[in-house]
Amino acid sequence: MGGGIAGLTCALSLHAAGFRPRVSEAARTIEAVGVGINLLPHAVRELAELGLADELAAIALPPSRLGYHDRAGGPIWAEPLGLAAGYRWPQFSVHRGRLHMMLLAAVRERLGPDAVRTGLMFRGFERTSGGIRAHFRDRASGAPAVEDADVLVGSDGIDSVVRARLHPDEGAARWNGVHMWRGVARHPHILDGRSIVVAGGTPGAKFVAYPIEDPATPGGEALLNWVLEVRHGPSVEPPNPSHRRVPAAEARAGLAEWDLPWLDPMSLVERSSTILEYPMLDRDPLPRWSFGRVTLLGDAAHPMFPMGMNGGSQSIVDARVLAWCLAREPDPVAALDRYDALRRGTVNAIVLANRNLGPEEIIARAAEHAGPLSADRAEEIATRYKRLAQATVAQVNTHASWTVPHPAPDPRRREAPGPAPTSTGGELTTPPSGTTA
């Protein structure tokens, strides 16, 4: 499977459930790259169930509130987050690269130093009498390799090769005409020092900022994540490449009309050592993820526009549900079908809701009315979205974790050494000892 956040969480979850997963990644090295990410309480809860609560708390910051503002910085509506909102688990803002490295270290510690292999290109798969045979190419040597496994789980991102094999007629990712510039920089506190702020007006004009670590000293500078969105018009095909490093001048050009009294966006952009430009992409919801012993997970299954802080969190839940299904259902095909049934409807609904701004509909409605919405109306929009994502306080606090109470009952899954993996874009759960490949 891909060695990103979803794939590594899946490996940890499968290992905890008694399986022998192996991870492969197309990139030659896995590095701490990227910008900020938010993990909602239901995702934090699942990482805590994997024994990662202390490690996560050490690298992340629990935000106190989410505030929506107009383009002049005026307040529209705000709500508490995490523990302050009544959840039993916090919400965390964290640098994606640090989260990635935390998960990678946990996988290597628990599954062994060779559990993650890099530089391997997934080429395709075939079904065998005992499972799946996946085909790969080593990027360094060009040599082909094969791997026999119980199941193949593609978590190789929005341009998933596994997804393309399962849905060969799908075509390119969908672009909505919005460009995003993203970066991180040290900056003085904004508002209470723990706020996520989303400022905007019409769709495609938005500035987001939030801290992703505590400052070294009270009142000092913190590391802030920022995102600028500008709509340049519709397009059938997304830009190529899908993301690139750009000079600060490109982002500054989109900030000419922004005036936020509690934040200087220009300064934040100028302080950023690296600025990345992305087109805002998603894909149409799929009617099916699982095909026999092959399935999809994370962005490979449901890439979505970044509204509502849901993408990474839903991928983590995917991983946990998949491991739970494989542990509870002895037939791998039935297990993947059950996973599909449990997850696909929820995340497909989120993908479609995010195309209509998700909870950020609050900003659009305020712009239409030339002023703040009523608190009741804003609360209604936010709650509707949370309910759809199964992320209200009541839904999260009362739903059992996806932890497997007892590891997989077949001892062969835990004790047999299993062959070395050579996959990318897919997770290989190796067959029990004695299985005929």
Give each language-model segment a name:
Residues 3-28, 153-154, 181, 209, ...:
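Conserved mid-domain beta->alpha element of the FAD-binding
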Residues 15, 40-167, 171-184, 235-249, ...:
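Conserved N-terminal helical subregion
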Residues 31-32, 125, 162-163, 304-306:
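Conserved protein kinase catalytic core
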Residues 31-42:
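Accessory recognition modules or surfaces
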Residues 34-36, 91, 238-242, 307-311, ...:
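Short, solvent-exposed loop/turn segments at secondary-structure boundaries
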Residues 73, 287, 308-310, 324-437:
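C-terminal helical "tail/cap" subdomain of flavin- and related membrane-associated enzymes
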Residues 75-100, 137-147, 186-274:
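Conserved FAD/dinucleotide-binding core of flavoprotein oxidoreductases
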